[in-house]
């Protein structure tokens, strides 16, 4: 009789030893062909022979399982009647967990109001379902099946008060992709934001028309909110204060009184700013 045995357990990518064993020594050299294509040689006068066969390699997407092989053909041996046991020889292939990692990169430098491109990349193409990457700035990046990266655009802040600075964003979470284990690279992606000079304009307006002796309201207006209180001195001696965070302030000034000798006219006022 001829039977087949195999290594009982091996790690992914390891080597399985298949051994064909005879109950009687071979009269001539013989070969034993297995269902996996491997061939075992048994020398004349020997009762067994072996061959090494590579177990399935490490797979980042799925766990390992069982591998079996059976005898499909024999030649030689010079036996009157050789009975080959076709029972499969089974090997447990143990899983080695593969960590796939998703990381984040960003545009290195941009101007205020410019575009920052955040790119999430994984070291093995996505299968099964898209990978959804959540960023610390509230945005998400979806890497589609078949791809290993995807990007999203972000507009750099444009601050009229304090120009320039930096942006630092990291991955908060990543899910999907049918990986055995998907890890997140916690390193932040940093972008230097260069200042673009923001011109802030101050303008002065007044009540269009008022009766002699009435009240004129002068209003100073900024195109951007004040970072600190702004004092506006008018040419008529009046002072307007614009509070921090506000864009305008007002002051009330009495118009020239009634004059029995001359008609009323126009009142013109200029402003001087003081912060």
Locate predicted features.
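Proline-enriched interdomain boundary motifs that mark the N-terminal boundary
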Residues: 1-5, 99-105, 198-205
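Short, solvent-exposed loop/linker segments at the N-terminal edge
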Residues: 8-14, 108-114, 208-214
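Extracellular acidic loop/turn motifs
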Residues: 25-29, 125-130, 225-229
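Short proline/glycine- and polar residue-rich coil/turn motifs
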Residues: 41-52, 56, 142-157, 241-249, ...
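Short glycine/proline/serine/threonine-rich loop/turn segments at secondary-structure transition edges
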Residues: 57-68, 158-167, 257-268
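Beta-sandwich strand segments
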Residues: 75-87, 175-187
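Interdomain boundary/hinge segments at the C-termini of tandem beta-sandwich modules
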Residues: 90-97, 191-197
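Conserved small/polar residues in nucleotide/adenosyl-binding loops
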Residues: 273-275
């Amino acid at each position: 009789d001829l039977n087949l045995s195999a290594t009982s357990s091996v790690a992914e990518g390891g080597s399985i030893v298949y051994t064909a064993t005879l109950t009687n020594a071979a009269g001539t050299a013989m070969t034993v062909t297995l269902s996996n294509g491997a061939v075992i040689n048994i020398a004349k006068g020997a009762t067994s022979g072996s061959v090494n066969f590579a177990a399935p390699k490490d797979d980042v997407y799925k766990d390992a399982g069982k591998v079996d092989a059976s005898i499909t053909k024999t030649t030689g041996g010079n036996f009157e009647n050789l009975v080959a046991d076709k029972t499969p020889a089974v090997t447990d292939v143990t899983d080695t967990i593969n960590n796939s990692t998703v990381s984040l990169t960003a545009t290195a430098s941009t101007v205020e109001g410019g575009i920052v491109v955040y790119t999430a990349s994984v070291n093995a193409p996505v299968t099964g379902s898209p990978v959804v990457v959540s960023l610390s700035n509230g945005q998400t990046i979806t890497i589609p099946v078949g791809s290993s990266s995807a990007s999203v655009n972000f507009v750099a802040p444009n601050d009229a008060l304090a120009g320039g600075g930096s942006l630092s964003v990291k991955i908060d979470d990543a899910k999907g992709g049918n990986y055995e284990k998907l890890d997140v690279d916690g390193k932040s992606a940093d972008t230097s934001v260069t200042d673009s000079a923001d011109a802030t304009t101050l303008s002065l307006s007044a009540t269009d028309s008022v009766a002699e002796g009435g009240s004129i309201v002068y209003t100073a207006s900024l195109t951007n909110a004040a970072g600190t209180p702004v004092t506006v001195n008018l040419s008529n001696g009046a002072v307007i204060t614009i509070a921090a965070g506000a864009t305008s302030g007002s002051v009330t000034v009495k118009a020239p009184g009634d004059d029995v000798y001359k008609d009323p006219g126009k009142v013109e006022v200029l402003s001087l700013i003081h912060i």
